[in-house]
UniProtKB/Swiss-Prot annotation:
TM segment ranges: none
UniProt xrefs under CDD domains: RabL3
Descriptive protein name: Rab-like protein 3
Annotated segments matching region Small GTPase-like: 1-235
Quaternary structure note: Homodimer. Interacts with GPR89; the interaction stabilizes GPR89. Interacts with RAP1GDS1.
Organism: Mus musculus
GO molecular function, one term: protein homodimerization activity
GO BP terms: B cell differentiation; natural killer cell differentiation; protein stabilization; regulation of protein lipidation; regulation of Ras protein signal transduction; T cell differentiation in thymus
Reported function: Required for KRAS signaling regulation and modulation of cell proliferation. Regulator of KRAS prenylation, and probably prenylation of other small GTPases. Required for lymphocyte development and function. Not required for myeloid cell development.
Pfam families referenced in this protein's UniProt entry, alphabetically: Roc
Gene name of this polypeptide: Rabl3
PROSITE patterns associated with the record: RAB
Length: 236
């Protein structure tokens, strides 16, 4: 196969939320049989057809960088991990739908990426809330994915999905909730597949068409990030 243009997408979230299983599902359309802890960073490739079915269709490589570790790691570990955050074109934030703390920690993961070069205007305070100040000049496309949907009891599902909708709204991002043990969760033609394709198209557009030849430093089209619904969202 001829060399293809590529984009780099970080996959961030707490250990145990299912990032490795998600990446394997997205890249190979198969369930990962024996997932293990990611040490450092693991990279896999998804082949994506940009604007599939149109005259502008073109095939790209999507590099999915599964970053391991904990958001509460020592500063030395975060400093080492920051090397993976260079030249990022998109970010997938992954949380476990059965674990509220993993959802809350997505804000800290996001700040860790943004803080690699400069201090943002939004700050983390001791009670876990975030300032509603705008992050200036941040245009990296984001997607929020909740895993382990199959483990949410039907009686709790509505409550959980409302909470995740608020979470995605805070990031001004689309959300996907799925079961990584079921390949049909992201099968072609499904609503999840449509959202994924739309996200990857946006990442490619930002990288290759929005500002030709330049990396874009932040989150895409953000009005405000970090506060919003989180003011009413606390972990037990």
């Amino acid at each position: 196969m001829a060399s293809l243009d590529r984009v780099k997408v970080l996959v961030l979230g707490d250990s145990g939320v299912g990032k490795s299983s998600l990446v394997h599902l997205l890249c190979h359309n198969q369930v990962l049989g024996n997932p293990s802890w990611t040490v450092g960073c693991s990279v896999d490739i998804r082949v994506h057809d940009y604007k599939e079915g149109t005259p502008e269709e073109k095939t790209y490589y999507i590099e999915l960088w599964d970053v391991g570790g904990s958001v509460g790691s020592a500063s030395s570990v975060k400093s080492t991990r920051a090397v993976f955050y260079n030249s990022v074109n998109g970010i997938i934030l992954v949380h476990d739908l059965t674990n509220k703390k993993s959802s809350q920690n997505l804000y800290r993961w996001s700040l860790e990426v943004l803080n690699r070069d400069a201090v943002p205007t939004g700050v983390l305070v001791t009670n876990g809330d975030y300032d509603r100040e705008q992050f200036a000049d941040n245009q990296i496309p984001l997607l929020v994915i909740g895993t382990k949907l199959d483990q949410i009891h039907e009686t709790k599902r509505h409550e959980v999905l409302i909470r995740t909708a608020f979470l995605a709204e805070d990031f001004n991002a689309e959300e996907i909730n799925l079961d990584c043990t079921n390949p049909r969760s992201s099968a072609a033609g499904s609503s999840n597949a449509v959202k994924l394709s739309r996200f990857f198209d946006k990442v490619i557009e930002k990288r290759y068409f929005f500002r030709e030849g330049n990396q874009i430093p932040g989150f895409s089209d953000r009005k405000r990030f970090g506060g919003g619904a989180l003011k009413n969202f606390h972990c037990d």
